[in-house]
Amino acid sequence: MINDGDCVLEVGGHIGYVTQIFEDLVGGNGLVYVAEPTPFSRYFLAKNVSSNTTILPIALSDVSGNMDFYIEEFGGFTNSLVSEFTETSSKWLKASQNKSVTEVKKIKVDVNTIDLVSKREGITPNFIKIDVEGAELSVLKGAEKTLLSVDALMVEISQDHEEIYELLYRKKFKAKKKNGNLLASHEHAGGNIFFYK
């Protein structure tokens, strides 16, 4: 799905675990763009990536501007534009780790769309990875034009399953689970799903 020289857009980079894999796959001739709005995560992301990666200090959605962004202070694993998602995940993290406090705080972040970022940066991504903790549908709605030329995506689907599948099927994508099994057109699985043309 990702070849040497490709351009990858990673939406939700956290601290760069997956970004490093993308760097290896695209090689020295490829490009990786990673959107990460959280200052704490971005600090470590910058330390973990190489010179062929461009860090975009923004969130991606279906609008441009400035929005509230919710951060759980356990490790930043469930930071999101969707407050309910972060609050629910924060409670689960608190219980699973026997922590007495897992705070959720709200910050303001710059927001843009994939279509506008692709145009501004002059890129045509071959592959897009979306891991945005409940905001997947909004990100995809902001990528209507870009999706026409994308070869493949990996979307971690947390909610809005049916709408996400319908949007991507309209764009002629097929869906596979991470184990490689093709999904039937009526099957709307969650988790990490690969879409390809």
Q: What is the predicted function of each stretch?
A:
Residues 1-197:
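Phosphate/nucleotide-binding beta-alpha loop and adjacent structural elements of enzyme active sites
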